[in-house]
Every structure is written in structure tokens, then in C-alpha cells.
Amino acid sequence: MSLSLWQQCLARLQDELPATEFSMWIRPLQAELSDNTLALYAPNRFVLDWVRDKYLNNINGLLNTFCGADAPQLRFEVGTKPVTQTLKTPVHNVVAPTQTTTAQPQRVAPAARSGWDNVPAPAEPTYRSNVNVKHTFDNFVEGKSNQLARAAARQVADNPGGAYNPLFLYGGTGLGKTHLLHAVGNGIMARKPNAKVVYMHSERFVQDMVKALQNNAIEEFKRYYRSVDALLIDDIQFFANKERSQEEFFHTFNALLEGNQQIILTSDRYPKEINGVEDRLKSRFGWGLTVAIEPPELETRVAILMKKADENDIRLPGEVAFFIAKRLRSNVRELEGALNRVIANANFTGRAITIDFVREALRDLLALQEKLVTIDNIQKTVAEYYKIKIADLLSKRRSRSVARPRQMAMALAKELTNYSLPEIGDAFGGRDHTTVLHACRKIEQLREESHDIKEDFSNLIRTLSS
């Protein structure tokens, strides 16, 4: 019996689990087999508890399959083992459209510096942290749409410079990417108060570089950015077509990774889809972990509204929160803005917050949403997206090239409009409500199983809500 047993388990787990789950939870594990005991080492307690809770039965089942009565006992521990005694899971890209994987060059961290065991006291130059102390993991509302992103960010905060470096978060505007950046920064500094953590928008990096060139201070610029312990850059897509900035960031990126210094980047799109950015940079963006943040589902939208109201000492009836969440679906920022308007109107008028009051306070916003998202608009958008005719969506054709877009359009109609299932079915060629319900459940299932369907749904939501 040897560590090849764990390799067999890894191969099977990679086949059985979604790519995101495998990369996030199984990949960081290290294994040691001795005395008929397989010890699995997790980088921190968070990963250990999650793996033991979610995947213990899977792993034990595989051990029994491969070894039968001779299956080793399983033991979990927090920590790492020497390289000669460990076996790490190979790196795989996650949450990515189907694509050809670019091999990642081997990176060997310098032995002299871990970057995190001994963080020095602040020294010149003075670092501008810019981390907003108000954005923490505690006040980030978690749901299915952002669960993986939050979990990855939490792990980076607990173990910066580790397995998820760089961490790349992508998704539409107002979905919580910036909140998570600040939460990681706050988490790192809570753990290491003297850590040099710098948050910035990508345009600030460009501005700093331009000033450095103008003032003949490019070496100081390089020293500043290459000596931080964690660099958190928002909206990296603004590097597009800025060749000199991309060149400098390329070398900064390499220097930070070689020093085991953490990099977190955000964008409104998947790395490979960022136009105007060099391929060598886009390739590096995907070296660590890439995770999507999607528009919040109904339950999460309600939870966001209730939490925001609670923070403002406002009693928000559940039916009112549901009413708002059902009608405003695109992003968190829009939800919070609408609630702020409701609260302000209630304070000015002294009236109770009811559904009728909300209808009045948000009448222009609600009217705009209802005007923008109609079943006709959904059918037109879906037909264009899948390059079929609207008539195909209404027809009786059952080929997958038509049936799947039809199901997608029905699911979007249920998500984005207030029409009943029978009304939606009637708009799709006179189908009954059970057909619509089946379509909605099918798309929900496929969003869990297929990255392509998940991406299609998110792209269409963004298009229809913009």
C-alpha cells in the first residue's frame, strides 16, 4: 500500500465532484500513509471542518472500494508535511468556460522568505492600506450565488500566499466583489496587524505609475508595489490597452508570487474574456483560483434587505422585503439603494413601511424594471443569445438546440417577471404550467451541474437587468 492509493482517490474525486469544489476543498489537502492510517492535512481548520463534514463519506467509500477489508483508517489534521512525504493535488482551473488549459510554469518560492511567518514592522515607504474597515466577512450576506467566492476569500484571509494565489473574483457590478476584497484585507490585518496590505482600483496603479515616470521615480514605484504582503486590485479590466501599465504589472505580479505575497484581483468578466489585456497576463490571472460571483437569488436578496434594515435599526416586515427583492434582481447595490430610499421616505413622512408605501416610494424604479423586463423582451434576448428564431421558442420542436433555450427563457421569465406559471406557459405557445415548472427545475439543476449553463443564465440575467 502506498501514496498511489491517495492518487487513485484524487482521480476519482476529480471525476465525481464539480471542478470548483475539487479545486477549492480537495486540492489543498496533503496526504501521508503509514501504519494503515491515511492522514490528510488541511491548510487550516476551516478547510478541515468543511472536508470532514462534506466529503468524509466520499473518501471512505473510495478507500473501501480500492482496498476492501484492508482499507486504512482516515485521520484529519491541520498543518503540512515535508515535501518528500506529501502528495499534493495537481492544479486545475475552475469556474471557467470550456477551453484549452495553458500549462503553468513551475514556481519555486524562495526558501529565505515565507512572507507570513515574520511580517516586519511598517517601514518607509508609508503604505496606503485603503482597506475599508466596515466591509468584513461578518456583514457579508452569504447565499448560493456567492458561497464559493466567500469561502475562497475566507481561506485567503486565513492563509495568505497559500494555495489560492492569485485569487481572481469575477462577476457583474454590485455583487460583492469589492466587499470581499476589503474583508480579506481586514482579515489579514486582524491576524498580522503589521502586514502591508494595499487595496486599490486598477486605475490608481496606472496613475501611480504615470507619476513615477514623470518624476523619474520608477524604482521607488517598483519597490513599493513589490514589497507589499498582499495586493488587492479591483476592476483589473481597466488595464485594457494600457501597454506600459500591463508591462509593469506583469513584472510586479511575478515578483509577488515568487515571494509568496498574496494577490487578489477582481473583474467584471472571466480572465480569458478581458479584451485588450496581454495573453501572458490573462494566463497568470488563472494560475491560482478563479471564482464567479453571480446575481443573488431571491432568498439572498431578502436576507440582504433584512440585514441592511437591521443595521439601520429599521423594522422591515418580511412581506415588504420579499416584495422589493422580487422586483429588484440585478445586484446588491441596487437593492441597498432602493432600501435607503424607502427608509428616507419613511423618516421624512413618519409613515409605516408597508407594501403600498414601498410601491409609492419606488414607483419610478419599479416602473422602469417592469418596462425593461417583459416576456417578449426575454424571448427576443434568449433567441439572439442562442442564435435561433423567436418562433422556435414558441414551436413544438423538441431538439436540444431549441428545447434548452426555451427552458432557459421560461426560467428567466419566472425569475425576472411577476407573471404566474400559467401566464408564462401561455406566452410560450400555449404550454401548461407543469411544463414551465419542469423547465425551471431543469435549469436550476443544470446550473448546479454545468458551468456553461450557469454562465449562460448569468449572462442573460445581466443583459436583461442592465
From Swiss-Prot:
Plays an essential role in the initiation and regulation of chromosomal replication. ATP-DnaA binds to the origin of replication (oriC) to initiate formation of the DNA replication initiation complex once per cell cycle. Binds the DnaA box (a 9 base pair repeat at the origin) and separates the double-stranded (ds)DNA. Forms a right-handed helical filament on oriC DNA; dsDNA binds to the exterior of the filament while single-stranded (ss)DNA is stabiized in the filament's interior. GO terms for cellular component: cytoplasm; plasma membrane. Domain I is involved in oligomerization and binding regulators, domain II is flexibile and of varying length in different bacteria, domain III forms the AAA+ region, while domain IV binds dsDNA. This is Chromosomal replication initiator protein DnaA. GO terms for molecular function: ATP binding; ATP hydrolysis activity; DNA replication origin binding; lipid binding. It is found in: Cytoplasm. SUPFAM superfamilies: P-loop containing nucleoside triphosphate hydrolases (SSF52540), TrpR-like (SSF48295). The gene is dnaA. ATP binds at residues 174, 176-178. Oligomerizes as a right-handed, spiral filament on DNA at oriC. Residues 130-346 are annotated as: Domain III, AAA+ region. Residues 1-86 are annotated as: Domain I, interacts with DnaA modulators. Keywords: ATP-binding, Cytoplasm, DNA replication, DNA-binding, Lipid-binding, Nucleotide-binding.
